[in-house]
C-alpha cells in the first residue's frame, strides 16, 4: 500500500474518528501505519498510509551518571626511603644511580609529589605515580654472613608497610639474573622462597648475601627494625647529578601528609666507589722480602666470568697499600697492579716503628677509593721469624 499525499480536505461533521496522524494496523500488511490523509469515495473512505517508525528509543531519557566522589577511607601517610645503589653494569659508570622508594600503608593513596632539597628550599622533581614501592622493616635480627655462597637454610622475617603487597619466589636461575633483590640496611640480599604469615609479615628463606659488593654490611648483620626495600621497577629514579647547593635529602608530599616527608639519601657515592679487593695473600722469601698480592674486582661485575678478566671500569688500575689507620696512614705505597713487594730492610724498619700496625690495600678509582682490605699485621710477620 503506497503512501500518497492529498491536500484541500475539508472538515466534515460526520468525518471518521480516525484522521491524519492516527496510528493503525492495515489488514494484510505487517507493522504499524500512520494515516497521512483520507478521502470519501463512493465505495467508502480511502486512507493514505505511511509506515510508522517509532521514535521511542531515541526519546528515552539517558542516565547522566554520577560524579566521582572519594572513598570513605581517609588518605594514608606517605612512606619514603632514598638511596644510592652500586653500579649495576648498565648505563654510564660515572652517573650515580639514585632512587626513591615511595609507598604507603594499605589504604587510599594516589602517590606523592617529590622534591629535592636545594639551598634550604624544596624544588619539584616530579610525581611518584600511584604505584607503591614494596618496603618495610626487619621483624627480627639478620645475623652476620660472609656472603660467599647461597645459604639455602638461612631465614629472615620482614614486615611490609602495605599488608596488601605480595612477594614472589624465584629459582636459582632467576636469582642469578638479579631477581628478588632486597636492600636491607646497606646490604643487597636476594631470596628464593617467601611465605606470608599475615598482616604484612613474611618469612624469607634461601638467601644470597652481600650482593653488589655489600659484603662489609653482610659481615656486620642487621638489627630488628632495619629498613627493607624491594629493588624493582617500582622505584622512582632520582636526578643523577646533584645541583650546586643540593643536599642529600629529598621530600615527598601526598594527599594524606600534613607536612613534607623527608629522607636522607643513603649510601651517597656508592655508585662510583670501587669494590673492596678480595683474596689477600702474603709470602715471605728466605731473604725476608714480603710479597703481597690480592684480587681486584670491578664495579658492575655481579658475576665471575670464567677464563677472562673482569673489565676494569676505572680509567686506570691503581692501588694504595698503607700501614696503620686508613684515615691517617703512617706509610703509603702506590702500585699499578694487584701486588707489591717490600724488601726485608723496609719490613724491619716498619716493625720498629709500630709492631701492632697492619698493612692494607684499597683500589684508587676514577672518582673514589674502595674500602681497605686487611693484608697482614706486622705482629704476624714477627711471629713468622720466631724459631
Which residue stretches match the model-derived regions?
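C-terminal extracytoplasmic interaction modules
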Residues: 1-387
